[in-house]
Amino acid sequence: MLKSISLLKNNQILLKNIINNGRIINNVGEKLSSKSLLKINYSSSTTDRTFNILDGTIDKNSAEYKDNLINMNSTLKQLKENIEKIKLGGGEKLNQKNISRGKLLVRERIEALIDVGSPFLEFSQLAGWGMYGKEEVAAGGIITGIGKIHGVECVIVANDSTVKGGTYFPITVKKHLRAQEIAQENNLPCIYLVDSGGANLPRQADVFPDRDHFGRIFFNQANMSAKRIPQIAVVMGSCTAGGAYVPAMADESVIVKGTGTIFLGGPPLVKAATGEIVTSEELGGADLHCRTSGVTDHYARDDAEAIAITRRIVSNLNRKKQPSPVITETEEPLYPTSELAGIVPSDLKKNFDIRKVIARLVDGSRFDEFKELYGTTLICGFARVHGMPVGIIANNGILFSESAVKGAHFIELCNQRGIPLVFLQNITGFMVGKTYESKGIAKDGAKMVMAVATAKVPKITMIIGGSFGAGNYGMCGRSYSPRFLYMWPNAKISVMGGEQAASVLAQIQKDNMAKENKQWSPEEENTFKKPISDKFEEEGSIYYSSARCWDDGVIDPQDSRKVIALSLSACMNQPINPPSDGFGVFRM
């Protein structure tokens, strides 16, 4: 997505998207046009060429590389086919119905809203996948992501009315709230393209009453407004019941004549409650709200005009990025990102040199490694991604005490210096056994977990292999609030591997049987273990995890560098302030 950075005299750096041809509005393995600019108003300097250059050489003719590549490409092919189905929303019939009413489809709206040729970093495309039985809720019924409007990075939240009328399933609420969380953490304006029937009534118990249910949307809007985060609502369809508060609580609201309606109670409810017969347009249409109620501020004759008005509103926000760390000119890695698909083994139990991955992600393949000879199963060091400084923490095997204290030390350094952290996760967990427990691996692991939890700098996590057990915590899993978390298609996430879980439970069962002088045949043991292993395998897959929004998207490995760069750029809208008080760096 991002390929070059130009250094200007006025100390502005422009991240230019120069990616072959074509453009996309999703984040899985497609190409972007060359016209997008991500403006960063920071101090700048020339490229830092003092870092060591990593040796990223690999043997592409080896059987292992070819096997890894075949497996990854097969997984990617299936993923892309599924995403193409998801992009159809509620299906061709409902799409045509929307078009016949003069409405743009949800992805067309987003494409028209963002700057021509600029990327749209879409979140959680697999949301809702397989969660509701025969009811397919494509993308969770809502499209969210970051796009640029007049050069301003904005979070976009767009209902898809072709998916169950745009009503809110539990996963729709979760995805909407996550988008607002991203906007708050990164100080990004939030644009709501509203076209929703409100809460999904059959699932109201899982949508309406709890803390992080439907009402939290408006709680967030109020608090975002208090933090001076702009919010713009564009009512392009139904906006019913509690959903009416979205435009009512926005800074500015646009409504489309003929299709946009806003009311707390729709015509059926009004008739049932009062006996009054009224049309949707009379009850809450554009004329009423722009001329009489004042709920909306801008009157649009169609979707195209509404989008033009919205772009104009954003142009008047008077926003610019805050001063942040020194940004340098970019260098492309010395090794192509396309080779990433063949580096990570298809068998996650196999070790590989994570530096081969880092060499394909960072500028000039330059990496200043920290404590290179100590705690070697965790690689830490400084680098740049599109000129932006980062501290990289990457698994290179299981975590030992030395690895954990090294990681904690490095996190403290980055937090002290205001340098964002990028975690490359491929971890089976911390080392176990009497020897390691006696040496205090629990307290050493806790140091790393404590450092991750309390670090105030932006954290971006990419799961490129396994993410198991306490290793997930130490490497900034979802519980530790990374600003963004992405997964590769081969990734697995679980409290432990399926085989390991089955063996643990089988051992407990055997111990219990032994107390009763009973024996267990190998066949009986295998029969016991298989469903457990299968269950863990299913629940650890990207489809299961991403469907539940445990991550912000599954990405093509070759897009990792550009996705990290886009995410870092978004983070830079919120000033990075190193701690001004408290403790200094504790050497571990």
From Swiss-Prot:
Keywords: ATP-binding, Ligase, Mitochondrion, Nucleotide-binding, Transit peptide
Subcellular location: Mitochondrion matrix
GO cellular component assignments: methylcrotonoyl-CoA carboxylase complex; mitochondrial matrix; mitochondrion
Catalysed transformations (reactions): 3-methylbut-2-enoyl-CoA + hydrogencarbonate + ATP = 3-methyl-(2E)-glutaconyl-CoA + ADP + phosphate + H(+)
EC number: 6.4.1.4
Region (Carboxyltransferase): 72-570
Residues covered by the CoA carboxyltransferase N-terminal domain: 72-329
Pathway membership: Amino-acid degradation; L-leucine degradation; (S)-3-hydroxy-3-methylglutaryl-CoA from 3-isovaleryl-CoA: step 2/3
Molecular function via GO: ATP binding; methylcrotonoyl-CoA carboxylase activity
Main localization of the protein described in the UniProt heading: mitochondrion
Enzyme class: ligase
Domain CoA carboxyltransferase C-terminal stretches: 329-570
Entry annotated with the keyword ATP-binding: yes
Stretch list, region Acyl-CoA binding: 366-395
Pfam families xrefs: Carboxyl_trans (PF01039)
One BP annotation, GO: L-leucine catabolic process
Subunit structure, as described in the record: Probably a dodecamer composed of six biotin-containing alpha subunits and six beta subunits.
Family according to the record: Belongs to the AccD/PCCB family.
Described purpose of this protein according to its UniProt entry: Carboxyltransferase subunit of the 3-methylcrotonyl-CoA carboxylase, an enzyme that catalyzes the conversion of 3-methylcrotonyl-CoA to 3-methylglutaconyl-CoA, a critical step for leucine and isovaleric acid catabolism.
Name the UniProt record assigns to this protein: Methylcrotonoyl-CoA carboxylase beta chain, mitochondrial
Organism this protein belongs to: Dictyostelium discoideum
